[in-house]
Amino acid sequence: MNIFADFDARIKKTLQDIDLKPKDGGDLDLSRIGVEPPRDSSHGDIATNAAMVLSKAVGQNPRELAGRIAEALASDADVETVDVAGPGFINLRLKATYWQRELSAMLNEGKDFGRSKLGAGSKVNVEYVSANPTGPMHVGHCRGAVVGDVLANLLKFAGYDVVKEYYINDAGAQIDVLARSVMLRYREALGENIGEIPSGLYPGDYLVPVGQELAKEFGSKLLEMPEAEALALVKDRTIDAMMAMIRADLDALNVHHDVFFSERKLHVDHARAIRNAINDLTLKGHVYKGKLPPPKGQLPEDWEDREQTLFRSTEVGDDIDRPLMKSDGAFTYFAGDVAYFKDKYDRGFNEMIYVLGADHGGYVKRLEAVARAVSDGKAKLTVLLCQLVKLFRDGEPVRMSKRSGEFITLRDVVDEVGRDPVRFMMLYRKNDAPLDFDFAKVTEQSKDNPVFYVQYASARCHSVFRQAADQLGLADLDRVGMAAHFDKLTDESEIALVRKLAEYPRLIEAAAIHQEPHRLAFYLYDLASAFHSQWNRGTENPDLRFIKVNDPDLSLARLGLVQVVSDVLTSGLTIIGADAPTEMR
């Protein structure tokens, strides 16, 4: 249960009970009432601004109104104290019996605790990575891959119907260049001395095996074909090889997509999908023939001083109208974006999320304009921009490219430090803030390494379970039996840990609503810190140890508390795509 939603309902019921009405008649607007944890935990367990946001409507001083509401809330059987603070905040302290009851509910829910129905009925498409299939993934792709993947996992946990999608950019000029680059490697594999790779082609050694496979399969037959036919075949084989490489890289990072959508699909049958999308916009009055004035600065590729087919994107929020078709009848890249969005919308998605690099900031307004025009404003579109990742080693910057001139790849990073540190640390800053990734920091065993600190808490939980088996003979812990003794949990430090656990459902919903998966990483660190602190208290004070051999009932109660900590850590780490270890190796 989300205790804050519970008390939101209780507070609104209290407002009805005291017959609070607006001075001008009608119904009170309760939408601005907030119920959340106080910024300072010493002030209580629940804080609300109800009196402050309603005072003007009811014509009463905020503090006086707060006193009136507080007096009514004090009669709630679960409330221990109610205080009015500052200009009219109301702080509630809840009884230990309430927290004991909530802990029992958490234990009963197990790893489903925190799961929400918030997104029930909403079908969401999360598109992320979508790297060009021209080579292995470099470290710059890593952050967007993790942010998109964890956001999708989070939304699923919050009840949304989610599809993870990768858009394969396999129809552009860069693919023609790639095919010519592989053709060169094919000739090399046949024994030809190709010399230096010509400027403009892809020089990477990762194309050598592709050329070798072609030589093994076809011998010299490709050289005997018409060039266009040979290049078409090479293009298909190369895209398959590059996507296999990319999928393997993503698999190493535990990133898995449900759908791989080929851009070339939009261009089949004389680009029927693109033509249909433009026709739909035309029928809605969003397309016209005209010229665009030359923009200031460097001219974009799709600008020409001739009449073109244009999208009236300025009418739906964009800065300028966008070309859809050039004067020679060729479609612009943007026309493909329109068709792709329409394809998603036609598949039944009412919300589309794009996770892009910060260098795609200029695409945001045009994508939003497309969403409004294609869906008549019915579809929601969100673009998350991921800022750069800077690599460090012991505080010293690491060059992003090797001596060979190739970029450090995603696989290089994962192979050196492991999947879990990469995934967790890519979330340890909000996506729109630059992130520093230190190879040494993410592998050290200290509190300063968040992923170690959180996973160590998980391992410590299981250490407690093993101690229970050794010292109490409890190899199989019974959740009902543990919950039966929660009335033994009365120490303030234990109740404080229950409070932190109780924040999890609210955290899940807030992170899903605001599409901010980094909140989960922060919460898990805070929970781990609270658990480690409780462990240390037991080291300093034997009365607070999780296992007291001479008091089996109290031990069972504390084991139940540890079990819920373990459940939440496992749940959160699973959403992040990392392991919840039972022991540290």
Swiss-Prot record:
Signal sequence, start to end: none
Placement of sequence motif 'HIGH' region: 131-141
PROSITE patterns per record: AA_TRNA_LIGASE_I
EC number: 6.1.1.19
Pfam family, one: Arg_tRNA_synt_N
Record protein name field: Arginine--tRNA ligase
Family designation: Belongs to the class-I aminoacyl-tRNA synthetase family.
GO molecular function: arginine-tRNA ligase activity; ATP binding
Gene: argS
Main location: cytoplasm
Species whose genome carries this gene: Brucella anthropi (strain ATCC 49188 / DSM 6882 / CCUG 24695 / JCM 21032 / LMG 3331 / NBRC 15819 / NCTC 12168 / Alc 37)
Subunit comment: Monomer.
